[in-house]
């Protein structure tokens, strides 16, 4: 157990018997009342956001974590098979842990996996931006290129994103894995 004053953004704590990551932590002392910490947390099992007010002298259970880099190999039913880049050991990571960004994973991508002190997987962090090839999209007509609209495109991983009209099949684009949005065209 450690004091809430020793916790910072990004720390992982056990709150109500489940792992939560601290996304924001603000110390407040309102008028003549006692000081407290307002914490914005994300439950790592359910993905729900939680707001909680800790008293200034309250203690929390800090989870000791270990971060390792793994390489994505393939998908096996509901799990993603990853390989440790240093020991070549393979593990299965549940699709719920990776979440929506999993649709942008392609073989060979590197993923940071965070383990709890008991060996369980807390979260998997994909690169913020990935470069993927557009495999299918409607061809743009001359009139379409003059407007600033967008059109759907299917990427090499099967994910669908909206892209500008000038993007064509076989173009390489950069996608933000957090939002699933097109960022820019990559010139190679």
UniProtKB/Swiss-Prot annotation:
BP-aspect Gene Ontology terms: peptide biosynthetic process
Primary location group: cytoplasm
GO molecular function, one term: translation elongation factor activity
Gene Ontology CC: one annotated term: cytoplasm
Pfam families: EFP (PF01132), EFP_N (PF08207), Elong-fact-P_C (PF09285)
Pathway(s) it belongs to: Protein biosynthesis; polypeptide chain elongation
InterPro entries linked: Elong-fact-P_C, NA-bd_OB-fold, Rib_uL2_dom2, Transl_elong_fac_P/YeiP, Transl_elong_KOW-like, Transl_elong_P/YeiP_cen, Transl_elongation_fac_P, Translation_prot_SH3-like_sf
This protein's UniProt keywords: Cytoplasm, Elongation factor, Protein biosynthesis
Family: Belongs to the elongation factor P family.
Entry function: Involved in peptide bond synthesis. Stimulates efficient translation and peptide-bond synthesis on native or reconstituted 70S ribosomes in vitro. Probably functions indirectly by altering the affinity of the ribosome for aminoacyl-tRNA, thus increasing their reactivity as acceptors for peptidyl transferase.
Stated name of the protein: Elongation factor P
């Amino acid at each position: 157990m450690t004091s809430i004053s020793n916790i910072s953004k990004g720390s992982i704590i056990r709150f109500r018997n489940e792992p939560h990551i601290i996304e924001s932590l603000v110390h407040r002392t309102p008028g003549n009342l006692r000081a407290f910490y307002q914490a914005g947390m994300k439950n790592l099992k359910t993905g729900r956001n939680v707001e909680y007010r800790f008293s200034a002298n309250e203690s929390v259970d800090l989870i000791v974590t270990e971060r390792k880099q793994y390489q994505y190999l393939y998908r096996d039913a509901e799990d993603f098979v990853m390989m440790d880049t240093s020991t070549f050991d393979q593990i299965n990571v549940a699709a719920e842990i990776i979440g929506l960004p999993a649709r942008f994973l392609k073989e060979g991508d590197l993923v940071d996996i965070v383990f709890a002190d008991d060996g369980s997987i807390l979260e998997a962090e994909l690169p913020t931006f990935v470069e993927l090839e557009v495999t299918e999209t409607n061809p743009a007509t001359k009139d379409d290129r003059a407007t600033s609209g967008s059109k759907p495109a299917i990427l090499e991983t099967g994910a669908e994103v909206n892209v500008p009209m000038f993007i064509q099949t076989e173009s390489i684009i950069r996608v933000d894995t957090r939002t699933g949005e097109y960022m820019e065209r990559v010139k190679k």
